[in-house]
Amino acid sequence: RRSSSAASDVYKRQEGNPLDRNNEWKNITCPLTGKKAVRETDTFDTFFESSWYFLRFLDPHNEKEMFNKKFKSWLPVDQYIGGVEHAILHLLYARFFYKLLRDEGLVDDDEPFVSLLSQGMVLKDGAKMSKSKGNTIDPDDIIKKYGADTIRLFILFAAPPEQNLEWSDSAIEGGYKFLKRFWKLSYQIRNSYDVPKDKDNKILIKHNETIDKVSTDLFERKSYNTAIAAVMEFFNSLSRSVDEGSISYESAKICISTMAKLLYPITPHICFTILSEIKAEKASNPEWPDKIEGVD
């Protein structure tokens, strides 16, 4: 192995291929024949590998094939997420390689990705957040103060994913206060109280409407901010009903459980704790909530 100083001499900015100038690396003894040999110095462009990484990840330890054909049933990729530059460069090359592999019978589909989501950038005072600009935020400091769930909630609530997000400390504080209210109400309804169930119908209608809204926004529209807004609106309605004593304990518990399940992909830590506190059937990775039948 060359010393770092010797290697730096070889790789100084010069015309041509730096590997071709590294004689110690290039000229070797063949490990199979014992004869003198010359290593290949041409290299692939980075896109040659990155254009089909999603295929290799299906079968990363296969030493005989790119990937086993049994994994074709997993294709095409359901969701491609990347920055705007991906839509011009990587997406173009990935589609090119995929069509080549299709022609060779390695895949069956014409396109590698079903859906594309190009997310926006994070801005600070209107400028792109980057290390070179010195305007980045240390996530560890924010997490220590507010918790990881608060940061996750803020990032997904502050703007639609395809738009730029303006970093705002005050908005983080707002998300933190909402989660504190959510926890407080959840803790409150652990203690059984009851009122006539015929007063529950209005909030249970809201319960079903919220499940429909959040399901559509998350899984079809990829509109995470409006999904969170729908849960917050539902929470405010439930909070008023509890304060007014116009909802039964069982219905309030159902509503809290549903909200925790709807927010679980976004704020998993507090939702797990809430589901545990109200003794939900499954607190870890719960099933998506069902609508209540017979409510209209």
Regions found by a protein language model. Give the residues of each.
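Single conserved hydrophobic/aromatic residue that forms the stacking wall/gate
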Residues: R1-A7, Y11
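Conserved phosphate-binding loops in nucleotide/dinucleotide-binding enzymes
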Residues: V38-T43, Y80-G83, L123-A148, E162-E173
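N-terminal catalytic cores of NTP/NDP-binding nucleotidyl/phosphoryl-transfer enzymes
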Residues: P76-A94
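Active-site-adjacent "gating/activation" loops or surface patches in catalytic cores
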Residues: D42-Y80
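Alpha-helical support elements that line or immediately flank enzyme active sites
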Residues: E49, R56, L91, R95-E104
